[in-house]
């Protein structure tokens, strides 16, 4: 048996195992099942741990690092993506349009190496992770990747003259000082069973919602007082192999694959566009794809459609019938102005303080 065949077989078994584990976890977290009560004691331990960590930082037993530049954290209080990365891209591009110099820091989930790094266009997902590459590609701003966000911020400030730094996730990273916190909530899944890890999907309690600057709902919401964010596409797909574009509705027959934290949202978005896929195949978030497995999914006349995040990992062995769907963020004019003006005020305040300090230092 050839090595590549054995490798594909092992990857297939790993995929099946991961999918089964994720299905069980989602069942416990998002359904009313008695199984969650068996994990509840561990959630109490988790609560005590995060409470102790919070107190240690609050009482200055552990150090919080502050910088002479505004840091905005875009995160959530549940496990999994709720639309954070598209929002980071949107905010980076909007601030760039307004002539502000923006940098981004990210954890870089799924990468093989742990050293801090600033992304360039030649880096691959195994070096810096799929989401940081996507942010860099779409927004064209400096992106630093490290499990230690303080190191990532210091790297950016060493090489770039920036006005603001955006942290993709990191809400629970207390050592990183910040002046703005935004929480993103997925309106479909919300908080699951409202329990803390591991009995539920929550990283911390809902009390955190009252302490942050903005709470943003991803999806339909009837409450007019809440900032609503919608994800949408422009009805075109891009070829992984040659970069050519095609109307989404012309992509038939189609097989959908998705390896993000909420695959159902992606599948639903495509179906609402009138596409009836032959199959919908879910992969775990940050999944490392196997060329042979993906190639075997389609026949000659079939198209393989994936998320843009998945395309970051698949473009190196792509086929001519593989496509991805770019996703964009939309806010109403009012919500957009509320968000951007609050960020710009902080930038201006920091600039004024720094200028004032420089004058005093010269005296």
Swiss-Prot record:
EC number: 2.7.1.130
Involved pathway(s): Glycolipid biosynthesis; lipid IV(A) biosynthesis; lipid IV(A) from (3R)-3-hydroxytetradecanoyl-[acyl-carrier-protein] and UDP-N-acetyl-alpha-D-glucosamine: step 6/6
InterPro entries reported in the protein's UniProt record: LpxK (IPR003758), P-loop_NTPase (IPR027417)
UniProt protein name: Tetraacyldisaccharide 4'-kinase
Stated family: Belongs to the LpxK family.
Catalyzed chemical reaction(s): a lipid A disaccharide + ATP = a lipid IVA + ADP + H(+)
Gene Ontology CC annotations of this record: plasma membrane
Family annotation (HAMAP family): LpxK (MF_00409)
A Pfam family recorded for this sequence: LpxK
Entry's Gene Ontology molecular function annotations: ATP binding; tetraacyldisaccharide 4'-kinase activity
Class of this enzyme: transferase
Taxonomic lineage: Bacteria, Pseudomonadati, Pseudomonadota, Gammaproteobacteria, Enterobacterales
Protein residues bound to ATP: 78-85
Keywords annotated in UniProt: ATP-binding, Kinase, Lipid A biosynthesis, Lipid biosynthesis, Lipid metabolism, Nucleotide-binding, Transferase
Function comment: Transfers the gamma-phosphate of ATP to the 4'-position of a tetraacyldisaccharide 1-phosphate intermediate (termed DS-1-P) to form tetraacyldisaccharide 1,4'-bis-phosphate (lipid IVA).
Keyword Aminoacyl-tRNA synthetase: no
Listed GO biological process terms: lipid A biosynthetic process; lipopolysaccharide core region biosynthetic process
